[in-house]
A protein has these predicted regions:
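PRPP-associated nucleotide enzymes
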Residues: 1-117
Length: 117
């Protein structure tokens, strides 16, 4: 498996991460979610470079063009709530992919909600 650490390279994603880590920026939930979505889009684009592709002919108004289409079947899975903006970013790139969702909750065993059981 190849690991691509995006923070090791100069790219716009570093700004999005810095904004998300900023204490004041985190208070604006809309901007925070939008940056999670943007990061999902960027990461999906980077992943798309590693997929398998095949050449296909596409008829255009000007003739026939050869285009490389991905052949991998993709399913995007996420854990509900926190992962949804990230998931949406991936769907913006992999719009023909399947979807999977996982839902979970914490069951507390005491009134103070400090013990999980």
């Amino acid at each position: 498996m190849k690991i691509n650490n995006l923070s090791e390279h100069n790219c716009i994603i570093n700004r999005y991460l810095a904004e998300m880590r900023d204490c004041d920026y985190q208070k604006n939930r809309l901007l925070f979610r939008n940056n999670i979505k943007r990061i999902g889009e960027y990461e999906a684009f980077e992943i798309s470079k590693t997929l398998n592709y095949e050449n296909r002919d596409v008829t255009t108004p000007l003739g026939v063009a050869q285009v490389n289409f991905p052949t991998d079947e993709i399913v995007i899975g996420t854990i509900f709530r926190a992962g949804l903006p990230f998931h949406e970013g991936f769907l913006n790139i992999f719009d023909h992919s399947g979807n999977a969702f996982v839902s979970a909750y914490r069951e507390y065993t005491n009134k103070e909600h400090t013990e999980i059981g």
